[in-house]
Design a protein with these regions (language model features):
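Core catalytic alpha/beta fold that binds nucleotide/phospho-ligands
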Residues: 1-107
Length: 107
């Protein structure tokens, strides 16, 4: 991973299989259930599933082995892993990973 290039993935929310979303860790599914707006819930589930798939390809480790969280500003972080970024707008979600430093992605 140390010399890996930046990696980007994107998806339409409607195109992500339900199985990918249902395979997320319980804590992430529970957080999604706390969103009142269905669009926001679907964006969150799609973003997490897409990010975990990207991290699996990027690191070679199982998708659910990555400990994801947020920094003090709400930006997603992967404990002990690459720098990550998530963006969503309407029905599109994008994720990015970089070997070190910071990364930002926007739609």
């Amino acid at each position: 991973m140390a010399d890996s290039p930046i990696s980007v993935a994107f998806s339409k929310v409607q195109d992500l299989p339900e199985a990918a979303k249902s395979g997320l860790p319980a804590a992430e599914r529970e957080r999604a259930d706390s969103f009142k707006a269905a669009q926001r819930r679907d964006q969150y589930l799609c973003a997490r599933a897409l990010l975990r798939a990207l991290l699996q390809r990027y690191t070679g480790n199982p998708a659910n082995s990555h400990e994801l969280g947020s920094d003090d500003k709400g930006k997603p972080v992967c404990a002990g892993g690459p720098a990550i970024s998530i963006a969503h707008s309407g029905g599109i979600v994008m994720c990015a990973a970089a070997p070190h430093g910071e990364i930002g992605i926007d739609i």
